[in-house]
Amino acid sequence: MRKDTPPPLVPPAAREWNLPPNAPACMERQLEAARYRSDGSLLLGVSSLSGRCWVGSLWFFKDPSAAPNEGFCSAGVQTEAGVADLTWVGDKGILVASDSGAVELWELDENETLIVSKFCKYEHDDIVSTVTVLSSGTQAVSGSKDCCIKIWDLAQQVSLNSYRAHAGQVTCVAASPHKDSVFLSCSEDSRILLWDTRCPKPASQMACNASGYLPTALAWHPQQSEVFVFGDENGSVSLVDTKNASCTLSSAVHSQGVTRLVFSPHSVPLLTSLSEDCSLAVLDSSLSEVFRSRAHRDFVRDATWSPLNHSLLTTVGWDHQVIHHVVPLEPLPNPGPDSVVE
């Protein structure tokens, strides 16, 4: 098992400092979120969690190796509060969960040199902790510390439904990549709910959390439509089949709580698990560890797999580092006598 991490990629020496219009002069300390776009561009969500003003910002890098150097970004914008979570909406839209209680939609404009606001809706009563876009791309889900979950119509810029199915703060929502009306949520009430917005009573409780520890992170399996994973406050990761939720595969991965779970784009996906123990682990389909890194010196907050190089995993953290890890992949099997190579 490999545990070493290569040094971050170094921006080319010939690159010139060129801060785009409307971008903040300085990036805040805490890197909260990172998402690759399909073309390999990198989006960062950043917060300032110290000082008199808790502000945040969004940064778009066409060259991910330049992040987090603000002078080499392609576009950037200040937000009025910290960024708790974000996700792409297509190739131009950016959906943001704000510490202010707002759900925000931003969009790249002017040849991707500006990030402009499309809407900002204050309909939650506390920090919006998590957002996800349903597979249709036209609707989104937000979860908040006000214990509420909201469904959004992105084109109409309105919330369609508001649900108080949880009795505790909502920590994660995760849209199914297979069905455009299905998503998961978990909360500090210890419950994981499976949602189908087509149903009169859309939420059903999953009986998969026998440990009693609070679930803290969720992710759908990208290829198996009935399978998801969740992490808990004790550092364990569990694999669940929604058709037989009482039978789960679990592994003690971290010494502290799991904060994020991200699947890779491989045909047999790897799973990245992030934790409050400041480490990241990459797990195979049996939840066995294939890679671990402790390169971050503070909480590691998000991870995103490169769509162009499937062995490249990028993480960000409160130590203001963007680290590009090369994850060892299993070697391809030798071609058999019946194999044909074109």
UniProtKB/Swiss-Prot annotation:
It holds the Pfam family WD40. Keywords: Cytoplasm, Nucleus, Phosphoprotein, Repeat, Ubl conjugation pathway, WD repeat. Its main location: nucleus. GO terms for cellular component: Cul4B-RING E3 ubiquitin ligase complex; cytoplasm; cytosol; Golgi apparatus; methylosome; nucleoplasm; nucleus. One of its GO terms (molecular function) is ubiquitin-like ligase-substrate adaptor activity. The keyword Phosphoprotein applies. It is found in: Nucleus; Cytoplasm. Gene3D superfamilies: YVTN repeat-like/Quinoprotein amine dehydrogenase. The modification Phosphothreonine is found at T5. One of its GO terms (biological process) is spliceosomal snRNP assembly. WD repeats lie at residues 22-75, 78-116, 123-162, 165-205, 209-250, 253-293, 295-330. The keyword Cytoplasm applies. It comes from the Eukaryota. Component of the methylosome complex composed of PRMT5, WDR77 and CLNS1A. Found in a complex composed of PRMT5, WDR77 and RIOK1. RIOK1 and CLNS1A bound directly to PRMT5 at the same binding site, in a mutually exclusive manner, which allows the recruitment of distinct methylation substrates, such as nucleolin/NCL and Sm proteins, respectively. Found in a complex with the component of the methylosome, PRMT5, CLNS1A, WDR77, PRMT1 and ERH. Directly interacts with PRMT5, as well as with several Sm proteins, including SNRPB and SNRPD2 and, more weakly, SNRPD3 and SNRPE. Non-catalytic component of the methylosome complex, composed of PRMT5, WDR77 and CLNS1A, which modifies specific arginines to dimethylarginines in several spliceosomal Sm proteins and histones. This modification targets Sm proteins to the survival of motor neurons (SMN) complex for assembly into small nuclear ribonucleoprotein core particles. Might play a role in transcription regulation. This is Methylosome protein WDR77.
